[in-house]
Structure formats: structure tokens, C-alpha cells
Amino acid sequence: MVGSNFGIIYHNSAGGASSHGQSSGGGGGGDRDRTTPSSHLSDFMSQLEDYTPLIPDAVTSHYLNMGGFQSDDKRIVRLISLAAQKYMSDIIDDALQHSKARTHMQTTNTPGGSKAKDRKFTLTMEDLQPALADYGINVRKVDYSQ
């Protein structure tokens, strides 16, 4: 997403009205203060108070404290938890796609390969390595011989 504004809509402060594809509802401009990026952020941050991320706040706070970051605002901790959850989800999804591609190649090369729709996948290093490499993380299997 290099070069994009990540969905943030900027309005001209001089009263011009380029909405970049977003309608303001009534068109009268009465809802103008609700469409500013700061109001979107404050709405999102207030919604984080009710949201429970998959990574508990205590775990996120622990690792933030280990890194030297301290915050008493649980919304900040939950925002970081949500970002970590999204990052991990993207990596796991990429690993799943690598696994599907690998198993598809194995079943097409094998005559009479199974084509079950409800197949279970196991996360292996073989699939995780290329997914992490896409994100610039290099991992290797541990050599068990000494």
C-alpha cells in the first residue's frame, strides 16, 4: 500500500467540497464535523473500550512494558493488541495459502488424490517460512544434531 492514504479522507478547510466518493448524507454540511479524520479516530477509540481482542490486555501490557512502553489507557493497549492480532492473522493466512498451494501440487501429482472440502490443515514450518519471509522475517528449523 505504498502511496495510499489508508482510507483516510481529507477535506479542504477552505470550504471547497471534494468528498472523494463519500457522501455526507443530507448534503447540507450539518454532519461535516463527523467526517473529519480526528472524529473517525475518536469514534474508533471509543469503540475499542467495548471490544475484547484475542490477545489479552495483560499479555500486551507485559510485552509493552518489556519494550519500555507504559500506558494507563486501556484503549491504547487494545489498539496495539488489535494491530498485533491483524499482523498475526495476515501471516497465518499467508501460511495457509502456502499450505493449500503445496498440498494442491502434491494431490495433482498423485493419481487419485483426495479432494475433500473439509480437510484440516496443520501449521508447519514448511508453510510458515515463506509466509514470514514475505514480511521480512527469516526463520530456520533448529538443527537437532549436536
UniProtKB/Swiss-Prot annotation:
GO cellular component, one term: nucleus
Domain of life of the source: Eukaryota
Expression across tissues: At embryonic stage 9, expression is seen in the mesodermal layer and midgut primordia. The mesoderm-specific expression persists in later stages of development and at its highest level is detected in midgut, hindgut, and differentiating somatic muscle fibers. Coexpressed with Taf10 in the lateral epidermis and anal plate.
Stretches the record annotates as Disordered: 16-43
Gene Ontology MF terms in the entry: promoter-specific chromatin binding
Keyword line: Cytoplasm, Nucleus, Transcription, Transcription regulation
Subcellular location(s) of the protein: Cytoplasm; Nucleus
Chief location: cytoplasm
GO biological process, one term: transcription initiation at RNA polymerase II promoter
Record text on subunit structure and interactions: Belongs to the TFIID complex which is composed of TATA binding protein (Tbp) and a number of TBP-associated factors (TAFs). The N-terminus interacts with the histone fold of Taf8.
Family: Belongs to the TAF10 family.
Function of the protein: TFIID is a multimeric protein complex that plays a central role in mediating promoter responses to various activators and repressors.
Protein name: Transcription initiation factor TFIID subunit 10b
Organism: Drosophila melanogaster
Lineage of the organism: Eukaryota, Metazoa, Ecdysozoa, Arthropoda, Hexapoda
Gene name for this UniProt entry: Taf10b
